[in-house]
């Protein structure tokens, strides 16, 4: 079905930048296939902004993205670029886009990637649309980010297995999940995994509180405890485990899940979200929009200025936090 194209878009570039997230390939696929359906050529930039200023660009067609929707990672590869932080680096990238006749750029990534796209547009006038791709779910302007659902499922699977062995040995496990600045993953995993306690960056409660929580769990007859800690909480899982051992003398184990949360086959929710947002990004350029992130709020597509995605804070659900406390008896 033809979509109006008042902006006269003929060629679009797409790149992935920063940390990878499950579902990025589904977003790339959606951009390419939506473009093809609307008579718009799509070029892919390899290795993000790092590859852009080096001219790592190639045409992409529907067959190039076939059999990719189920794959983790990103077929375009990703990298962090120090060169892009300089005006000279961005000028070189802009020249590459002009050389390829690009009318607009779709950036799939997090706030760092959006910074790069924002300054490219401000300095060189190339329309940029952001697509939220980060497992942390910390971008303002969308209910969820691409990769978040899969990261939660990956972490939860590990928590379930650690709970089995923890209960068998009557042992405490302190499990660290990703989330440098936000506790979305930690909070969801804590509720879904039945954790006794959760520590998130948004809540600066004293680390010593965990000692009383563990003692209370033992008094209630629990054979083991699961404590979830977001990596952004002061001191991380190691500090929490040390506090428990110092205050109780109990055997405590730390498990840092790390980068495993970024990998793996994306779950259906991430594939669907990525497909919708990739399509919406192309339509946004055709509508003449620029400097915005396409997100999903309440089931509909929302457009948020790129600078607001990092200037405004996306809070964790206080209702869910209350629920975690209520159920940890």
Swiss-Prot record:
Substrate binds at residues 134-136, 171, 178-180, 231, 253, 259-262. The keyword Transferase applies. GO terms for molecular function: 6-phosphofructokinase activity; ATP binding; fructose-6-phosphate binding; metal ion binding. Keywords: Allosteric enzyme, ATP-binding, Cytoplasm, Glycolysis, Kinase, Magnesium, Metal-binding, Nucleotide-binding, Transferase. SUPFAM superfamilies: Phosphofructokinase (SSF53784). ATP binds at residues 19, 80-81, 110-113. It is found in: Cytoplasm. Mg(2+) binds at residue 111. Pathway: Carbohydrate degradation; glycolysis; D-glyceraldehyde 3-phosphate and glycerone phosphate from D-glucose: step 3/4. It catalyses: beta-D-fructose 6-phosphate + ATP = beta-D-fructose 1,6-bisphosphate + ADP + H(+). InterPro entries: ATP_PFK (IPR022953), ATP_PFK_prok-type (IPR012003), PFKA_ATP_prok (IPR012828), Phosphofructokinase_CS (IPR015912), Phosphofructokinase_dom (IPR000023), PKF_sf (IPR035966). Allosterically activated by ADP and other diphosphonucleosides, and allosterically inhibited by phosphoenolpyruvate. It is an enzyme of class 2 (transferase). GO terms for cellular component: 6-phosphofructokinase complex. GO terms for biological process: canonical glycolysis; fructose 1,6-bisphosphate metabolic process; fructose 6-phosphate metabolic process. Catalyzes the phosphorylation of D-fructose 6-phosphate to fructose 1,6-bisphosphate by ATP, the first committing step of glycolysis. HAMAP family: Phosphofructokinase_I_B1 (MF_00339). Belongs to the phosphofructokinase type A (PFKA) family. ATP-dependent PFK group I subfamily. Prokaryotic clade 'B1' sub-subfamily. This is ATP-dependent 6-phosphofructokinase.
């Amino acid at each position: 079905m033809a979509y109006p194209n008042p902006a006269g878009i003929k060629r679009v570039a797409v790149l992935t930048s920063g940390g990878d997230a499950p579902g990025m390939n589904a977003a790339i696929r959606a951009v390419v296939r939506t473009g093809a359906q609307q008579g718009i050529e799509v070029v892919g930039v390899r290795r993000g902004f790092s590859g852009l200023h080096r001219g790592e660009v190639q045409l992409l067609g529907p067959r190039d993205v076939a059999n990719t929707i189920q794959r983790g990672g990103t077929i375009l590869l990703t990298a962090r670029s120090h060169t892009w932080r300089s005006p000279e680096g961005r000028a070189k990238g802009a020249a590459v886009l002009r050389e390829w006749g690009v009318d607009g750029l779709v950036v799939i990534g997090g706030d760092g990637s959006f910074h790069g796209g924002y300054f490219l547009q401000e300095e060189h006038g190339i329309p940029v649309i952001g697509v939220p791709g980060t497992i942390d779910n910390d971008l303002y302007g969308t209910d969820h980010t691409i990769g978040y659902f899969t990261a939660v499922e990956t972490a939860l699977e590990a928590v379930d297995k650690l709970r089995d062995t923890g209960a068998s040995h009557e042992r405490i496990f302190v499990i660290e999940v990703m989330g440098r600045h936000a506790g979305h993953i930690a909070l969801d995993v804590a509720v879904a995994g039945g954790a006794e306690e959760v520590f998130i960056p948004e809540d600066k409660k004293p680390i010593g509180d965990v000692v009383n929580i563990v003692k209370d769990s033992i008094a209630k007859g629990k054979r083991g405890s699961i404590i979830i800690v977001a990596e952004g909480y002061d001191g991380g899982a190691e500090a929490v485990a040390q506090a428990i051992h110092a205050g109780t003398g109990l055997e405590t184990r730390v498990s840092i899940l790390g980068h495993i949360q970024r990998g793996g086959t994306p779950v259906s929710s991430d594939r669907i979200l990525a497909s919708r947002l990739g399509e919406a990004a192309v339509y946004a350029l055709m509508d003449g929009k620029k400097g915005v992130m396409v997100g999903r709020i309440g089931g509909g597509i929302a457009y948020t200025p790129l600078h607001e995605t990092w200037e405004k804070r996306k809070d964790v659900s206080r209702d869910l936090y209350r629920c975690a406390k209520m159920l940890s008896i």
